[in-house]
Amino acid sequence: MGMQMKNFKKMMTLMALCLSVAITTSGYATTLPDIPEPLKNGTGAIDNNGVIYVGLGTAGTSWYKIDLKKQHKDWERIKSFPGGAREQSVSVFLNDELYVFGGVGKKNSESPLQVYSDVYKYSPVKNTWQKVDTISPVGLTGHTGVKLNETMVLITGGVNEHIFDKYFIDIEAADESEKNKVIYNYFNKPAKDYFFNKIVFIYNAKENTWKNAGELPGAGTAGSSSVMENNFLMLINGELKPGLRTDVIYRAMWDNDKLTWLKNSQLPPSPGEQQQEGLAGAFSGYSHGVLLVGGGANFPGAKQNYTNGKFYSHEGINKKWRDEVYGLVNGHWQYMGKMKQPLGYGVSVSYGDEVFLIGGENAKGKPVSSVTSFTMRDGNLLIK
């Protein structure tokens, strides 16, 4: 998409889990074939029958599925997404249909990149997509979501669509001599000036309604990971502003249609590092009661720069894709070991006690088609 996409990808780059454990590769874990095409900044979900669906992002409008219950597991292409190519959407299964919320993309070849607030759903039985007659209360990009039950999904976080959209409008309108000024002015602001979304929304697919369920107990984030287990919600890290992460993990209990916030926690520093920068685009999921968080990316030193008053906190810092894995064991976060390679911005899907890491972006910023998994087994973290 020319210079506009170049700036968009730069923006996505910037935004954009003590137990004694052993890291091994294991024959116990399920082995899945690579996705038919590399995938980063995509989305995915699993249905109640053990079928995983992934698509969008660098796959364009393509979607694929794989049945985990079949003896011979292969990816199959399903009907293409009708809403246009987009990145950073969120998807969940509700009422046996795949719902896709928001994202960022171009409506046509001439339009600027923009945040979407639309919703689509896919019927596995009919192999058809349908645009849902609703729009989200705010634009949804950099948001995160978790399924609450068969009819409701919780969605929170994400960028401010007006500020985000204006950046790309300004970049497109600027000549070459002005672009660096536009970029600097956009990034050189305190976190509060980006107005990342901190409202928690509940969408009810049966009633096709949205509900305000309150606000996050701290700052809004973008690029956070989220998981739900036994009615406990975990919102993991994310960006406070472009280039600046947080190491905070929000925890809440969902009970009687009400969200009650509990005490926050923090990821520990990586071995050899003085502080935890926090992660955006990390993989996450539960295995045998242990919450595992791995991969993602950050800008080492950005947090200290921001503390020192430098608002363009990641200026001049190379983005670092992470390979560390952390685990929440008996209420305490611990460093568990390393992934096969640094990776972030892929799709996390849990099935039983396996957490599948599908696609992602490698340390060169390129999308990958690999599928790996985390599993806790007999006190060991198994990586397949």
Swiss-Prot record:
The residue range of the signal peptide is 1-29
Q: What class of enzyme is it?
A: isomerase
**Catalytic residues?**
239 (proton acceptor)
**Record keywords, A-Z:** Carbohydrate metabolism, Isomerase, Kelch repeat, Periplasm, Repeat, Signal
Molecular function in Gene Ontology: racemase and epimerase activity, acting on carbohydrates and derivatives
Spell out the InterPro entries in the cross-references. Kelch-typ_b-propeller (IPR015915), NANM (IPR056734), NanM_proteobact (IPR019936)
Q: Which cellular component terms (GO) are annotated to the entry? A: periplasmic space
Q: Give the E.C. number(s).
A: 5.1.3.24
Quote the subcellular location field of this record: Periplasm
Residue stretches of each Kelch repeat: 51-95, 97-149, 151-184, 185-230, 233-282, 304-353, 355-384
Under catalytic activity, the entry for this protein gives: N-acetyl-alpha-neuraminate = N-acetyl-beta-neuraminate
What assembly does the database describe for this protein? Homodimer.
What does the record give as the function of this protein?
A: Converts alpha-N-acetylneuranimic acid (Neu5Ac) to the beta-anomer, accelerating the equilibrium between the alpha- and beta-anomers. Probably facilitates sialidase-negative bacteria to compete successfully for limited amounts of extracellular Neu5Ac, which is likely taken up in the beta-anomer. In addition, the rapid removal of sialic acid from solution might be advantageous to the bacterium to damp down host responses.
* Cited NCBIfam families: muta_rot_YjhT (TIGR03547), PRK14131.1 (NF010730)
What protein family is recorded?
A: Belongs to the NanM family.
Name of the protein described by the UniProt record = N-acetylneuraminate epimerase
Species whose genome carries this gene? Salmonella enteritidis PT4 (strain P125109)
Please name the taxonomic classification of the source.
Answer: Bacteria, Pseudomonadati, Pseudomonadota, Gammaproteobacteria, Enterobacterales
